[in-house]
């Protein structure tokens, strides 16, 4: 019997599964893409498998990278944590997707010279307890976008945290496979270069077994360094850079939904009550890279990054296929 295969799905609300049945979870039969991936694996005989939904709604790529552990997160200034009291890690401010105002920094610098602040939006099983210099703390969100910490096990002593101390979150840092899906919250402050460099660092955390999911819509049009005068030119540039950076580890959801999304959903039994004419309209929209409302969580808006159960099923199938093609699966569920 091989060891259990552990898959971490790390990202923001599109991984969490906004307003989905069993959101922020990966239980059998639930609706988020990690849960549907787990269901597909179990239904295909992969019994010895664990899929973790590490999606945090509202987080930017800095936080996703931090939680994976691809780049260290450090305390930016010396902190004194009093006995039995909380201390602030700063209040998050945002401008065009950029986070400022926190006392947590990603240890990464590109040619921009910007300091990359970190702010965790959720304090669930993959965040708490955080560990700094061997001491465990509980982190929380209080007031207006303020991260605070207090000692988990009090010894009735004041604690000094020197500037530059590394913070570890509680998630499993050495899964067999990391599936990375993010970037929808970063806006104009983000760049494709930063996305690829940070993701490549995350890819090495567990020895290089990873999958990168591209966005289902054109969020990359907002990133500062994506070249092209038209939307199509920008997409081709984004796709080329991602394929060059990640090779066959990259799943281009923008393209896959256009070519295969509807057929995958129909094959799984979805859209039985939709007419052939309505399906033709959906297919035409997908070919033009428009996400139909039937694939969106509220069934109303088009092109929303937050998908419905049907949309997340498509992602789960594509990930399952790629796990097999990359040789990450065997029938016993191990690696």
Please report, for each region that a protein language model flagged, where it lies by residue.
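Alpha-helical cap/lid subdomain in secreted, periplasmic
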Residues: 2-3, 31-47, 65-335
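Catalytic nucleophile-elbow at a beta strand-turn-alpha helix junction centered on a G-D-S/GDSL motif
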Residues: 4-23, 27, 31, 57-61
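Short histidine/acidic/glycine/proline-rich micro-motifs that form metal-
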Residues: 14-17, 55-59, 185-187, 217-219
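A short beta-strand-loop structural module common to alpha/beta enzyme folds
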Residues: 44-62
């Amino acid at each position: 019997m091989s060891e259990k295969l552990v898959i971490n799905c790390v990202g923001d609300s599109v991984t969490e599964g906004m307003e989905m049945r069993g959101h922020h979870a990966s239980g059998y039969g639930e609706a988020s893409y990690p849960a549907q991936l787990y269901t597909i694996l179990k239904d295909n005989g992969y019994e010895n498998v664990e899929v973790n939904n590490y999606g945090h709604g509202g987080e930017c790529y800095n936080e996703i990278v931090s939680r994976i552990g691809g780049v260290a997160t450090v305390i930016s200034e010396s902190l004194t944590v009093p006995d039995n009291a909380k201390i602030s890690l700063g209040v998050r401010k945002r401008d065009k997707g950029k986070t400022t105002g926190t006392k947590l920094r990603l240890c990464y610098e590109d040619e921009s010279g910007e300091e990359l602040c970190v702010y965790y939006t959720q304090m669930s099983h993959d965040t708490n307890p955080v560990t700094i210099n061997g001491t465990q703390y509980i982190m929380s969100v209080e007031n207006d976008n303020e991260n605070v910490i207090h000692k988990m096990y009090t010894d009735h002593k004041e604690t000094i945290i020197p500037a530059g101390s590394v913070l570890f979150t509680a998630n499993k840092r050495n899964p067999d496979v990391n599936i990375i899906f993010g970037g929808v919250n970063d806006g104009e402050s983000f760049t494709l270069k930063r996305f690829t460099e940070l993701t490549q660092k995350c890819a090495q955390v567990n020895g290089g077994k990873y999958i990168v999911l591209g966005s289902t819509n054109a969020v990359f049009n907002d990133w500062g360094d994506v070249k092209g005068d038209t939307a199509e030119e920008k997409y081709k540039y984004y796709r080329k850079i991602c394929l060059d950076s990640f090779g066959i580890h990259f799943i281009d959801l923008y393209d896959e939904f256009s070519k295969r999304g509807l057929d995958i959903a129909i094959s799984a039994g979805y859209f039985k009550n939709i007419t052939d004419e309505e399906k033709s309209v959906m297919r035409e929209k997908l070919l033009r890279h428009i996400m139909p409302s039937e694939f969106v969580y509220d069934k109303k808006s088009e092109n929303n990054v937050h998908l419905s159960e049907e949309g997340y099923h498509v992602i789960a199938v594509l990930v399952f296929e790629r796990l097999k093609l990359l040789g990450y699966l065997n029938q016993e569920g191990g690696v």
